[in-house]
């Protein structure tokens, strides 16, 4: 199991946050990474869901900010996501269909 250790000693399990985030509107898949001591969500948008709800690419940043706010309401203070970074394509996967995390850690 993957774990992120914060500077104040908190253990964060990104898969638990990703499971919540992947159930949010317009999120196809996600990956939680640490960047400069803060948690960032890498998100591949669900473009089909966006189309069916009439959400354009121009509206996407605002929609993702709403997703981030709703997600943070479900998380402990030390698990808060500071920003969402959009990825246009699905993440690279292993043959077992799990995301190759090491490719996105930097």
Predicted feature locations:
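AMP-binding/adenylate-forming catalytic core of the ANL superfamily
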Residues: 1-78
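Conserved C-terminal "lid"/linker of ANL adenylate-forming enzymes
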Residues: 29, 37, 66-106
């Amino acid at each position: 199991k993957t774990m992120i250790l914060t500077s104040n000693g908190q253990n964060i399990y990104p898969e638990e946050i990703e499971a919540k985030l992947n159930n949010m509107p317009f999120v196809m898949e996600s990956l939680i990474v640490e960047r400069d001591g803060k948690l960032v969500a890498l998100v591949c948008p669900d473009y089909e869901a966006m189309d069916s709800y009439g959400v354009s690419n121009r509206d996407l940043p605002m929609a993702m900010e709403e997703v981030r706010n709703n997600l943070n309401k479900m998380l402990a203070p030390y698990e808060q996501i500071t920003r969402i970074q959009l990825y246009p394509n699905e993440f690279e996967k292993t043959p077992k269909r799990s995301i190759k995390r090491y490719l996105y850690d930097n």
